[in-house]
Amino acid sequence: MRIVVLTGAGMSAESGLSTFRDSDGLWNNYNVEDVATPEGWARDPKLVTDFYNARRRELLAAKPCEGHRLVAELERKGHQVDVITQNIDNLHEQAGSTHVLHLHGELMKVTSSLAPNDPSQISTLPAGHPDVHIGDLAPDGSQLRPFIVWFGEPVPQIAPAIE
């Protein structure tokens, strides 16, 4: 049986990760235009880098919740499970899911500032080393940025999600 699971912030909130829109969410402490847009990156890449470094450190302390584990268990029982998530964390993968499509990017990955969706520029940060610094460069020589789909950017994984 093929099962498609769509998840969002509520799943990761159960693991203790901060959400963006809750009453005490991240958007209450940060202006979305400052940390989640190409324009914010152009104005202050250090602020954006620090913001996502903090998100990565938070993720390193988190563990998959029961929901993540139940989805992975379906796969272990032999079902074809495709997870389509709006979350940028890797908690589905940590729980054991192997077919995860991240619509909005992946927090533990970085990419080129000039060509953020070029597969040759995307890399995974080393385990246990979540921080990126100004001066850390992508293969094309540009500043590394988070591999996150920011507001105003196209969602490259939307076509595969529809399939």
Regions found by a protein language model. Give the residues of each.
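Conserved catalytic core of sirtuin-type NAD+-dependent deacylases
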Residues: 1-163
